[in-house]
């Protein structure tokens, strides 16, 4: 097998429904003749969403008791808050939000922005503790 077809080293992330420490360290990159792919999880119990944030909008400042989230910015730069850290993540950047961490996504741009979200742990939309919310929910 040529070097372009070999998979990069990977450490198993979780066993069963455990929440990983930081899965961004274990994203698998594989090059192929047609291009490449990134593998974020393998055979794990997860919930996967693509979140679209409209220009000038942001999600509530929130935390979760039962899940951690891995975010992958898909297109336009997205404002990120995780804990006390705030920054603008570029397309392709991976962000780990540990269980219990205060976090938020926002779109400072002029076009909709998308983020792939992979939630590890027990997923339930009721497991959202909103600390601030622009929409009074």
Language-model segments: what does each one mean?
Residues 17-31, 104-137:
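Double-stranded beta-helix
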Residues 66-79, 83:
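Glycine- and acidic-residue-biased ligand/ion/polar-headgroup-sensing regions
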Residues 25-68:
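A short glycine-rich, His/Asp/Glu-containing loop-to-beta-strand
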Residues 63-65, 73, 107-110:
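Short glycine/proline-enriched turns and hinge-like loops at secondary-structure junctions
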Residues 84-102:
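Short acidic-glycine-tyrosine-enriched beta hairpin
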Residues 4-5:
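Intrinsic-disorder-associated, low-complexity terminal segments enriched in Asp/Asn/His/Tyr and depleted
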Residues 55-57, 66-67, 85, 101-102, ...:
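A generic "binding-loop/recognition-motif" signal
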């Amino acid at each position: 097998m040529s070097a372009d077809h070999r998979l990069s080293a990977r450490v198993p992330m979780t066993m069963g429904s455990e929440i990983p420490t930081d899965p961004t360290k274990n994203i698998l990159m594989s090059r192929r003749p047609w291009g490449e792919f990134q593998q974020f999880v393998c055979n794990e119990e997860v919930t996967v969403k693509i979140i679209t944030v409209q220009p000038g909008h942001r999600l509530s400042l929130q935390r979760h008791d039962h899940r951690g989230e891995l975010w992958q910015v898909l297109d336009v730069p997205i404002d990120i808050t995780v804990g006390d850290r705030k920054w603008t993540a570029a397309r392709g950047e991976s962000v780990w939000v540990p269980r219990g961490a205060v976090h938020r996504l926002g779109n400072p741009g002029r076009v909709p922005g998308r983020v792939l979200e992979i939630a590890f742990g027990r997923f339930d939309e009721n497991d959202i503790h909103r600390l601030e919310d622009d929409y009074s929910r």
